[in-house]
Amino acid sequence: MANGKKLIIILCLLIGITSYNHIGLTMEKKPYHHVSDGTFRNPEGSPERNTNFKWSYKVFNKEKKKLDMTVPEEHVVKKEKVLSDLSKLKNDDYIAWIGHATFIIKLGNTTIITDPVFSKNAGPLIFGPKRFTEPALKLNEIPKIDLFLLTHNHYDHQDMMTIRRFPFKDAKVMLPLKLGKYFTRNGYRDVNEMDWYDEIKINEKLKITFLPAVHWSKRSLTDTNKTLWGNFLIEYDGKKILFACDTGVGNIYKDLGNNMAQ
């Protein structure tokens, strides 16, 4: 009986050691930006974010009142001209800035939209920071979209009102790890979560690669860095376009420049 107990104890210890080693090996295989608790972090050697900084709407609004918030009339292109220009260029390649981080990029037969935000406010409530100017187009005025790129989950980039009301839910969605649920829940059928350096070939001329950025993610008090963030490299017919996430500086950009900018 004593020998039987010893055998059980030894087996338990062996199982524990094997499990521990398996977990260790699994984590060793994961890239640096994957943290063991399931969150993400910036590329190795990136500047550290100051976690002691506290955001305050009171301070923000106080400082904002000191600024001249008047937008020069010539800064905003008239709606008629925007629609006219897009109509003239419908058979050409173009990049159109809609506002903030929202661009419409037409390359061949593929039309891309980036971080579309058509709401008046950026935040979980209607009282979030308000945009200075309206987007160049309304959501129901944009051309047919084939490819939807999302860099990260901050409210001024991942706008749930726009995602829910987006008129082209058959578009291919490309976005960081762990953000797909926001789209599948809202009727999108072609949702592709991507890790850094993942690439997807759209057609013979067009390829999209998801690249590292020096940033972070957060939409609530409890989800800091639980979803990934990043940049998109758009390669089309020998040309390269980098659509950058909100990003700080970091050594990673020297590496990306050396490896991707050729």
Model-based region annotation:
Residues 22-23, 27-43, 138, 147, ...:
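Cap/insert and terminal regions of metallo-dependent hydrolase folds
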